[in-house]
């Protein structure tokens, strides 16, 4: 049995499959009954976030008159008919307790603080969006959008697309599913298609589309479009459909009531990645949004565009994201139980969005949209998705879960389909030919498959089931085989008194670096101590290491590891080394947020027991990344070689190096102590620490030089374009030019000559601008006593308090009499006493954000003045740390939840 390295107990138990999700900013959400519990995997027993599922009032969709009799002693406003038309399940479901059914994290950058949004679908069919309480100082997450309410308003404004004639308002007879679809039963029942294809959303057929020669031409489907409404005042397109002018108090048939309720009853949610499109020649017209898919009981999937904020902040804000309904796809004839998104295309010019949907009728379909259609869809509200292929036809066994990944290793799409019978299928689709073939179908479990998760670019697959088994599979070419989950765990710190009496496993999720696995399990309460454990431990989240898994790679281990050590075999060391290097290589992608928590935690665990293995992995990564080849030389000889290459490597590599230096190789030192050593003297008797301190110092100086150069270049370009081009408020404008110039003067002997030249040009330009704001801000004031502050360091400052003039003494006493101030790590200006951006790795504060160009630089620019003006166009500047590259956040008290990228 695999050994967990940490765990987190839950006070409530999950009830549905796919109960756990891992966000791209390193937070874990668990749908546990009437609560959604958010956990920081770096502090599993620490503070948590909560979402309490509220009771939902039924929507006013109509009244049903009894077809045979009128019940006496009931008010005239009540019409009942529970035994006809399928109304009995609709009535019974309102008596159930609130419960979270499905959840999905958005991509990073959707929250106002550049974090992730969480979409939650309840058992009552309601979908809402939540943001973290970054400025509210509470544990409860903040609801920002009620998507179900928006859907109700849109549909009710059109009378649900039904004809006004009473003779045509009735629908066909229907079968239904058992409403209580909890994991304890999970039975599949037949159900006919709901009459949702006549919504007043224009219907269109895409059966033989010329742009997709390989799509399934036999399976017809309906894509429902949103109509464009005109405002009476200015005639422009309105972003929202008109609201209903009346409540639905008319009498309707039971069949119509069930049909309307099925349209509004959501079952599953899925976020796409954050998409970026330029709608014009200027970056000011950049479109940034994510697609939110919501599956319903009617078999339809509604596609919503949720636009990202134009700017990010950490102050309190009541602004909600702009959300628009773009299309409703009649995807299946029964409940849409699960969905998954993917992106096909190596670059933005050939981007294709892929949506896979699974239904309780056993069918699975693949939908696709081109980039041009997505951009057009934003403007004219037309659906851009067409049916690419029906992978699985109607089947009596329902689809319980999906996992979909587009593998760059195989240049193919890998689709895993979990079913209620305990089996799962793996399908492969070639991107070039769009040929879809089934690789395997296996009876992996005895009960319903409750979770599937791909790892290592589609080479490994995890499956879990209600039978409490978790299995690991390796995909090699067109075959899949099961491999055992390694029992050896580096740095095992799991508590021994944690019970192992689990009943079922209800979800599996992978960390951003793929090195850790999270499992959510329900306890068998009857086997727990009724006095203590049974009261507070209904379920648990287990964490397993995934680094020792075979990933299909055939790399040989380094010669240094020649025998088993500390219970690890030579092959396990080889797998760890391969997976470490794979994860580090993946983070070179600028579109992937720099979240290194799992890698840092694993390296620290190995460092305690086998530090030479960590040094071996880092030596190989540093030599390959910085020198271009594997240099099998000692670390003390390698460091001088790579430090000379800093100006020729991308900024992302420098950020990864800084994080590893601080959190792994200098982990014995506190962050404040590391910062002090970077500015002052070091101990000569700590050779290894001095080696990494020197490497960290030179890497951070390289990043600061790039920032200073970009700041000077942006200012000069903006000054030269005045009078010829209208000034744009969207361009990034540098701050603290006076402080940046002083830093260049202090470090004139080590900075590149190009920076000295630019600094002199900026100084001359500021002198010519008599009304320049930068010139007036050359002398800074203390925000507490208004005393002058001189520039002596880029990290901190001391004001010249009037008290210190009365007493000329040592520097220490002088500093005691003055205020110690922090400087912004970007502008080097004195930070005001207001909420600031905070880095969890280097503990620096940031007032002004660095330009996005800095994080994408492939090397130090040879000619900063030749950079195009578009390099400084503001496309929602991302709050990333200048030195670490991780997401900045507002500093929270220790008793409140916050994400830990490292």
Short names for language-model regions:
Residues 2, 26-93, 130-155, 216-250, ...:
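Beta-propeller domains
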Residues 2-13, 19-20, 26-27, 524-902:
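C-terminal scaffolding/assembly regions of large eukaryotic complex subunits
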Residues 8-11, 50-51, 92-94, 257-260, ...:
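Short C-terminal beta-strands that terminate individual repeats in beta-propeller domains
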Residues 11-20, 96-110, 152-168, 172, ...:
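Canonical WD40 repeat/beta-propeller blade segments in eukaryotic WD-repeat proteins
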Residues 25-29, 111-119, 278-282, 286-293, ...:
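Structural hallmark of WD40 beta-propellers
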Residues 32, 121-124, 295-298, 358-361, ...:
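Conserved strand-to-loop turn within each blade of WD40 beta-propeller repeats
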Residues 36-41, 103, 127-132, 269, ...:
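WD40-repeat beta-propellers
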Residues 160-240, 299, 362:
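Long intrinsically disordered, low-complexity regions that are acidic and Ser/Thr-rich
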